[in-house]
A protein has these predicted regions:
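Conserved catalytic core of sirtuin-type NAD+-dependent deacylases
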Residues: 1-177
Length: 177
């Protein structure tokens, strides 16, 4: 680590567990049950095709994920990563988490490969907006400009990773360690 030209930190749901967030799979995980209350697999409910067909169903589940994230604070792991970034010239965090806790801890060089639940994007005109939480949002929320349904800027099951995040990761990898 002392001799590395760059450091890449990779995190997933486990890093936010000490902040009180459940992991997605396993005992106590958000997706512990095989099926949702609607009798559908969570992978089907939280998918792009379902968002197009039944946005209210997708949003009900996304809102429950956001509610779990609401008010949660970065933990010591998030803080240490942010401190490392401030002390080293090139530190990049690649995270699968959509909770935004790395940024909340002060990290600036974060690649959120699965997106961020606090950014909404219009499915009609691609307008984006940041939201602190979903409290008070009509579900599904609609774009103020074109009235199309908005979606959280997260990767749903079956969707491709965001090209900009993948390109940034590729740039970091090509720059070497």
């Amino acid at each position: 680590l002392r001799e590395a030209r760059a450091v890449t930190v990779m995190t997933g749901a486990g890093v936010s567990a000490d902040s009180g967030l459940p992991t997605y799979r396993g005992i106590g995980g958000l997706y512990e049950d095989a099926d949702t209350d609607e009798g559908l697999p969570i992978e089907e409910v939280l998918s792009g095709p379902m968002l197009a067909r039944r946005p209210e169903l997708v949003w009900r589940h996304i809102a429950s994920i956001e509610a779990v994230c609401r008010g949660v604070q970065p933990n010591r792991a998030h803080q240490v990563i942010a401190q490392l970034e401030r002390r080293r010239e090139r530190v990049v965090t690649l995270t699968q988490n959509v909770d935004g806790l790395h940024g909340a801890a002060g990290a600036e060089q974060v690649i959120e490969i699965h997106g961020n639940i606090h950014t909404l994007r219009c499915t009609g005109c691609d307008r984006t907006r940041a939201v602190q939480d979903y409290a008070g949002l009509a579900l599904p929320p609609r774009c103020e400009r074109c009235r199309a349904v908005e979606r959280p800027e997260v990767v749903l099951f079956g969707e491709l990773l965001p090209p900009a995040a993948v390109a940034r990761l590729q740039d970091e990898l090509e720059a070497g360690f």
